[in-house]
Structure formats: C-alpha cells, structure tokens
Amino acid sequence: MRTHFCGLVDETLIGQTVTLAGWTDVARNQGGVCFIDLRDHEGIVQVTVEVDNAEVFAVAASLGYEDVLQVEGVVRARHAVNDKMRTGKVEVIATAITVLNKAAPLPFHAHENPGEETRLKYRYLDLRRPEMQRMQRTRIKLVQALRRHLDEKGFQDIETPILTKATPEGARDFLVPARMHPGEFYALPQSPQLFKQILMVAGFDRYYQIARCFRDEALRADRQLEFTQLDMEFAFVRERDVQDFVEDMIRAIFKEVVDVQLDASFPRMTWAEAMRRYGSDKPDLRIALELVDVAELVKDSEFPVFTGPANDAEGRVAALRIPGGASLSRKQIDEYAAHAAKYGAKGLAYIKIADNGEISSPIQKFFSEASFAALVAHVGAGNGDIVFFGAGGYNKVSDFMGALRLKAGKDFGLVADGWAPLWVTDFPMFEWDEEEQRYVALHHPFTAPAVDDIADLRANARTAVSRGYDMVLNGNEIGGGSIRIHRPDMQSAVFELLGIGAEEARAKFGFLLDALNYGAPPHGGIAFGIDRIAALMAGTESIRDVIPFPKTTGAQDLMTDAPSPIVDAQLAEVHIQVRPKTN
C-alpha cells in the first residue's frame, strides 16, 4: 500500500513518484490549493493538491482530522522551506488520494494535551501524538538494546511461570482461582525471584528475562499494578562481580539509546551514609544540599524538642541549610512544615538570616549567645540563608528532612543538569515492624547477610547488614539486587528471625529449601525497572507515559473498562461467590 514512509521523504526522491499512507494531521483548503500534513510513525510530510486536478482536489477539500489516506504523488522541492520539519525541504504533489477510513469527530486532537483520564480512555488516540510516539520508541529501543547486550554476553533468556504460588514478598498478591482445584489459588508473580534462584541451582549460570510482574499495591506516578523488569541472576559471583557487569551494561545502554555518557565509575555509598547525609536510601546527588547532625551542639540547650532526641542513642537532631532560603515568607515556611509533616514531622524549627545579617528564629531564646552562634557556624549558615531543623527518632528525622531536601532543591533551582548515578550498599538486613512486633526483611527474605555465622546473625539481628545493593540514578532506584542465601540452614534461620516458623516456611517455601539442599551455588543478581529507566530516558516524571496501556491511580483501565463485574455463571465455574461489600 505504500512505497515510502511519510517522515522519510527527502531531497533524494525529488522527481520520483511515491505512494504514502497515513493520517490527516492537518488539512488546509486555501482556495486554489489544498495542503495536507500527512503523518505516519516516522513523521509528517506536506502533500499539495492543486485545483486543476479537480477530482483529487474535491477529496482533499472534504478531509477531516485523522482521516486515513493513501496518497500517490510526485516529490518536488518546496518553494518555502520549513526548517521545523524533517521533510521541510520537499512536498508531494498528489495525483491520487484514496480515503481508506473516515475518522469520527475526535474527543481531542493529536496536538492537544487533554486531561489524563481522557488520554487513557482514548489511549489509541493519545499514542498517535508525536510526543507519545517518541516516548514509546525510547522504551522499545531500551528493551532491544538490553536484549542485544545480554545475548552477546552469554546470558540465557529463560521464561518463568506467570501462574505460581502465593509467597510474601512485601506487597499483596494478585490471586487467580484454580478451577480444577476448588478453594485453591494461583498467584501472579511479584517477581521471578525464587524461579531465577532455582535456575542457578539447575546450572544455567547466567539468566535474564524481560519479566512481567504484578503487585496489588497503592498506585502513584512511579507505581503500577503490573510492571516490567529486567531480571538477572549470576552463579558463582560476589557483589562486585554483579555490580561491575551491570554498571558497564547501563553505561553502554544509555549511550546507545539516548546518547548519554554516564560516569566512568559510579560512586558507592553505604545505606548508613546515604541516610545520614541525604535522608534517603536513593539520594539525588544532583542536589548539593546535605543534612548536618547537630545533636552535640543542642543537647544542653533549654529546648526540650531538641534535648530529648539529642540525648537518646536512637534519636537524631539534623539541620538543612538552604542557600537563599531567607526569602521564604512565613506562609511558605508553614508550607515546608506541612510537607515535612507528611513524612512524620511534628514540627519544624528554623533559623532565618536576612541579607543584612538580622536573625529571625523561634528557637534562639533557648540558647546562650555563644551556643547559638556555634550552631549557626556549624551548619555553615550565612546571610540570606534559612536553616531547618528536625528532631525525633533517627529514621523518621532522616525521612522528613530528606523530603525537605528534595523540595528545597526543586523550589530553589538547585538541581544540577546531567546524570548522577551511584550504588547504595550495605543495607540493614532487617527492620523492626512496630505494628506486627517482629522483624521484616528490608530487601526480601532471600538476601544473604554479611555474616556467614548463624549464631552471630541471631545475636546481632538488630544491627545485621545485608549483602544487598541498589543502583540509583537522579534520585530514582532503577535497580535492586543482592547476593542470595544459598545455604538451607541460613535460609531457615532468616525465616525464623522474620517470624516464619518451620511449618509455615515448609508450606510456603519448601520447594526452595529442598533445592538449596541439593548443591546450590553461591549466586546473586539484580532487577531493573524497565518502566522507570524508560521514563528517565524519555524525560517524563510518570512511568504511565512510557507504558502503552497503563492503569490509573485508581487501578482502572479506562479504555477497556477493567476491572469489571463477572457473571455468576463464570464465578460458579471457579467456585467463587461474591459477597456484598459492608462498611
């Protein structure tokens, strides 16, 4: 139906007859001549229809937005070059136009940017927009480049099951009723974690998969119910073996897909250092602001909000200096306090130093002149700055001060251009869940501890460090991995520390424990979020822009109207009865 793509018609084709097919982007009838911007996935070319070709002119004059056309014509140099178009030096003089399909009146035009609900309801129209085409192509190029790179490095692309066993990995499972086994259910995989470990036991050595994963969790801009990850696993490796390989891979992929040259060597930072300096386990290093601990300077003050945490081994008092922040009004300071409150802050103390050196602070009265001056000097504050203070439990203070750091960086234009990758390592093995009164795994239950001795792990569970690692880019965790537990006795001990008894462990993970018993090699791996990397490459804040058919934050597919009710007959086949929802 066509000989060339619209967006690839150029000067080399001048004088030649071409057949094109695409959509009417714009049609303009200027009396003696009609101009049609014909669009396909490669771009737009101008089609010109002259009035002396009456039959073709009549067709052109009747066209509407998004009508589907086949155009035959001769390529000619344009009198008025359009430098904004790739095809702007040529036009196609139409000799025949066939309308392949008329488009109904549109809910929005390809050049408009309607609300997200409208875009998702008519996703097929939204995806026609050039910007959406660009972002989807970025994703396609990313996946192609990853596959090519891993195939060349000897990795084996192995599929793992979609219908599998429900196992706890931190989020709620999507359950699928098993019709042939009444009352029993499959679960959709949250990740291929256990299968890829078993593939290492099976001797496949280097595995990868572009895997679909499912987690029934609350949605936001960087979360979806179903998502795609590059899953990788290596046998007989230590942390640096995995990190060095994937660092080289990510560097090569960014260069190939978006022509970005990442650092020759990614910096490394322990989890403890990241939390201390940046209040985040995925710090955005493009923002130069850092948290400063001030407990030693405030522990003897008369301000109880500070003295309590400052004299508590598990407390923290931290400061954040914002250059130029003295320009903040009282209302704006209150907005910062409200932002911190979302992350657990109960208040936000501050010191504001005007350009003339005048100090405004609600906490100054609780300090002697000398101790207050020492505090200001310690945080490096000068004229024109504001300093925010957070006090409380160590982790909570780190969280809300880290959130303030990000907000201040954006508000004050302190986010540097470019790319800032790093490795975050040495994560805590466990964290204490106050609600459940037990330890939970910070990464997942299959991450190896840094110690090999089970007695040591049991005795020091609270401070145990894992062999986990995350790759962070511009404040986004793009990949997370670890060295895995390969000894069955260590895996059983970790289950025990997590409050998973022997009977429960056998019921949920018996197949894994059995596999580890039959000669499991030391192994480790990593998983990268394809959606998130594609969004970063495409320059969009929301992963929904790089997913062809995403769900809304309300967990709905507006185009297909999913989820939707199921008729009783279908429910009966899978032995399910829906009970009315009660408040």
Curated annotation (Swiss-Prot):
Homodimer. It is found in: Cytoplasm. Residues 193-196 are annotated as: Aspartate. SUPFAM superfamilies: Class II aaRS and biotin synthetases, GAD domain-like, Nucleic acid-binding proteins. One of its GO terms (cellular component) is cytoplasm. It holds the Pfam family tRNA_anti-codon. It catalyses: tRNA(Asp) + L-aspartate + ATP = L-aspartyl-tRNA(Asp) + AMP + diphosphate. Catalyzes the attachment of L-aspartate to tRNA(Asp) in a two-step reaction: L-aspartate is first activated by ATP to form Asp-AMP and then transferred to the acceptor end of tRNA(Asp). PROSITE patterns: AA_TRNA_LIGASE_II (PS50862). Its EC number is 6.1.1.12. Belongs to the class-II aminoacyl-tRNA synthetase family. Type 1 subfamily. It is an enzyme of class 6 (ligase). L-aspartate binds at residues 169, 215, 443, 484. This is Aspartate--tRNA ligase. GO terms for molecular function: aspartate-tRNA ligase activity; ATP binding; nucleic acid binding. It comes from Stenotrophomonas maltophilia (strain K279a). Keywords: Aminoacyl-tRNA synthetase, ATP-binding, Cytoplasm, Ligase, Nucleotide-binding, Protein biosynthesis. Its main location: cytoplasm.
